[in-house]
UniProtKB/Swiss-Prot annotation:
The keyword Repeat applies. It comes from the Eukaryota. GO terms for biological process: central nervous system neuron development; memory; negative regulation of proteasomal ubiquitin-dependent protein catabolic process; negative regulation of protein polyubiquitination; tyrosine metabolic process; visual learning. TPR repeats lie at residues 51-84, 86-118, 123-156. PROSITE patterns: TPR (PS50005), TPR_REGION (PS50293). This is Tetratricopeptide repeat protein 36. Keywords: Repeat, TPR repeat. It comes from Homo sapiens (Human). InterPro entries: TPR-like_helical_dom_sf, TPR_rpt, TTC36. Pfam families: TPR_12. The keyword Repeat applies. Belongs to the TTC36 family. Gene3D superfamilies: Tetratricopeptide repeat domain.
Length: 189
């Protein structure tokens, strides 16, 4: 099956426009690990480990298509540590997949509030909230959330900001057309 990093590379190749960093077990580097440790150091270690295990079970259930089990596990993690943003962020993803956009937005608001708008959970919550806003045609709200996620280091959010910028999109299209013409010059008859 490959290492988590192999999976991340394949994810980036085959799905370049999906949020990166949501792959369970992916080694995001020392900075991300430090960020996560700082977010979690306020919680009792035993409860934190149990909460993370429940979240992992929830993510695995969601990936297997068992959204009811995923929601149950995320709910258990929230009951265990109701002040930890990560479980709300994960539950929001499962709720969105289930079609409960209002519930997903509610969880994302709570995750942003608990994280203080900082760290990995906030970054992921801003990206998710931005995607939901974009799907609902609320581009200004989407842009604000993507800007916040980009400031927190999300490359996906940066790409979304470019896509939301009509001038950048036009420039990218013109550049692509020019490069295509340079690669395939017309017959000079």
């Amino acid at each position: 099956m490959g290492t988590p990093n192999d999976q991340a590379v394949l994810q980036a190749i085959f799905n370049p426009d999906t949020p990166f960093g949501d792959i369970v077990g992916l080694d995001l580097g020392e900075e991300a690990e430090k960020e996560e440790r700082e977010e979690d150091e306020v919680f009792p270690q035993a409860q934190l480990e149990q909460s993370k295990a429940l979240e992992l079970q929830g993510v695995m259930a969601a990936e297997a298509g068992d959204l009811s089990t995923a929601l149950e596990r995320f709910g258990q993690a929230i009951c265990l540590l109701p002040e930890r943003a990560s479980a709300y962020n994960n539950r929001a993803q499962a709720r969105r997949l289930q079609g409960d956009v209002a519930g997903a937005l509610e969880d994302l608001e709570r995750a942003v509030e608990l994280s203080g708008g900082r760290g990995r959970a906030a970054r992921q919550s801003f990206v998710q909230r931005g995607l939901l806003a974009r799907l609902q045609g609320r581009d200004d709200d989407a842009r604000r959330d993507f800007e916040r996620a980009a400031r927190l280091g999300s490359p996906f959010a940066r790409r979304q900001l470019v896509l939301l910028n009509p001038y950048a999109a036009l420039c990218n299209r013109m550049l692509a057309d020019m490069m295509g013409q340079l690669r395939r010059p017309r017959d000079s008859r």
